[in-house]
C-alpha cells in the first residue's frame, strides 16, 4: 500500500462517469415538498473538533430533529461530500474549510416522521454522511453560528457523551456518529501501523480495540 494512500476505514470514494454538468435548477417550496415525498435526500453532516479534542453540536429548533444534533444539511447534485460539508460549514459557522481537511466518519439511512417543509407530517427519508474536521483556535474564535435553525450550540468531550452514565442522552444516529468519531483515532492508528509494516501483534491489538 502506498504511503500516501487514503485510510480505507475513513474514506468515502467519489466516482464520476463521463462528463457530468452541474445544473442550477431551483425548486419552489411546493415542488421541493413533493420531491421529499418521492426521493431520499442526501445530507453532509459535520462533527467539528478543536485542538483540545472538544466537539461541537447544535441544539436544533426545527424538524426533523428539534434537539441536539450535528451541524450540516443537504448535498446538491454534483457535490463531493467534502464540497457539501464545506458549504454547509460556511453557512452554519462562517468558517471556510478546504476539502482536503475533511475526513469521513460514518454514514447511515434515516426515516423521520416530521420535517420542516410543508406538509410537515409527510416526514423525510435521508441518507446521511457524517464528516469531521479539526479547526484551529483562531477559527473557533471567529465562528459566527447560524441562529435560523439552532437555538444554541455547545462544545463537548466526545468520549463523555458515549459513556453509559452520560447525562445527555443522544439520538441513536448522533450517538453512533460520536462513537465512530472516537473510534476514528484507532482507525487512523491502525492505518498508520499497516503502512509502517508494524508487527502483527500491534496491528491485531488495534483491530481488537475497534470491536470493544
Annotate each PLM feature.
Residues 39-41, 50, 63, 123-126, ...:
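A generic fold-level signal
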Residues 75-171, 207:
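Unchanged
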Residues 2, 64-66, 140-212:
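Nudix hydrolase/Nudix homology domain
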Residues 68-72:
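A short gly/proline-enriched turn/hairpin at secondary-structure junctions
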Residues 2-45, 120-121:
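Acidic, metal-coordinating catalytic segment for phosphate/diphosphate chemistry
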Residues 53, 62, 109:
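Short, glycine/serine-rich, charged loops/turns that create anion-binding
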Residues 30-55, 74, 128-134:
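Conserved N-terminal beta-strand and adjoining loop/helix that marks the start
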